[in-house]
């Protein structure tokens, strides 16, 4: 549709300059190689095709996480959110997980959502760790605000990382009181939780860049239902 670019200049929020996230490869528990790379805006329509069926799965609050993630990615695609980014995990080209967040300012980051489309392999945990790696090591932020919407998210983020509770502080997503990750906490947790190798072998990177393959909806539902791994 045609755009009134003069009006768009008013409607589009400020965007901070963000260095790219360098891709890496993670060996999953089943021996498969997951390429973690940064999405570009043009990837959003393909990513949304994987997120959409998850919106109707109640297990572990997949419905609310997926619905919010869908809206956040669409807002990024339509230039309606400030300084958002998205990282994704691919196995043999298939999209198996998505994480996103944004910069509140140059010092403070907002963690948005973590969605594992293939369960039982710690894909969500690996992608969350990659997201924190991006905020702390590459964006050089002083803190990342995090809130959980599910019990498993609380265990994976707040407990595993020993996050600091921020009494009286409301995360952008609403919900419970926000927690934060600081560089000190990140580097303390990094040896246990942040994994992956760089550079990605050329054949694996080429396969990931070639296409974002979306699994059929019934297969996505089966994966989230607890059947291990692609």
Q: What do these predicted ranges mean?
A:
Residues 147, 162-182:
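Conserved catalytic-core motifs of GNAT/GCN5-like acyltransferases
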Residues 121-136:
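Conserved acetyl-CoA-binding loop-helix of GNAT-fold acetyltransferases
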Residues 47-55, 131, 135:
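Hydrophobic alpha-helical core bundles mediating ligand binding, dimerization, or RNAP-core interactions
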Residues 1-42, 196, 202-230:
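Conserved N-terminal entry element of GNAT/NAT acetyltransferase domains
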Residues 144-159:
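Conserved beta-strand-loop-alpha-helix junction that forms the acyl-donor binding cleft
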Residues 87-89, 133-136, 154, 173-176:
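Catalytic cores of nucleotide-enabled group-transfer and carboxylate-activating enzymes in metabolic
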Residues 38-41, 51-109, 113-116:
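A conserved beta-strand-loop-helix scaffold within acyl/acetyltransferase catalytic domains
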Residues 84, 139-141:
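Short, high-confidence coil segments that cap the C-terminus of an alpha-helix
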């Amino acid at each position: 549709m045609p755009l009134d670019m003069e009006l768009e200049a008013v409607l589009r929020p400020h965007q901070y300059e963000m260095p790219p996230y360098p891709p890496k490869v993670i060996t999953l528990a089943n021996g498969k190689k997951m390429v973690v790379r940064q999405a570009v805006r043009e990837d959003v329509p393909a990513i949304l095709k994987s997120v959409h069926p998850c919106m109707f799965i109640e297990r572990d609050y997949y419905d609310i996480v997926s619905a919010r993630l869908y809206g956040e990615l669409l807002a990024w695609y339509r230039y309606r959110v400030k300084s958002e980014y998205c990282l994704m995990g691919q196995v043999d080209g298939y999209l198996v997980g998505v994480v996103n967040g944004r910069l509140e300012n140059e010092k403070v980051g907002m963690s948005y959502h973590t969605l594992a489309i293939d369960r039982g392999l710690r894909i969500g945990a690996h992608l969350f760790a990659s997201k924190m790696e991006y905020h702390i090591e590459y964006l050089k932020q002083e803190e990342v605000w995090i809130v959980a919407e599910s019990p498993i998210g609380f265990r994976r983020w707040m407990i595993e990382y020993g996050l600091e509770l921020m009494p009286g502080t409301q995360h952008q997503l609403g919900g419970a009181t926000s927690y934060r990750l600081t560089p000190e906490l990140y580097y303390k947790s990094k040896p246990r939780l942040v994994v992956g190798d760089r550079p990605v072998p050329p054949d694996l990177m080429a396969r990931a860049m070639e296409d974002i393959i979306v699994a059929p909806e019934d297969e996505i539902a089966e994966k989230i239902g607890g059947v291990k791994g692609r």
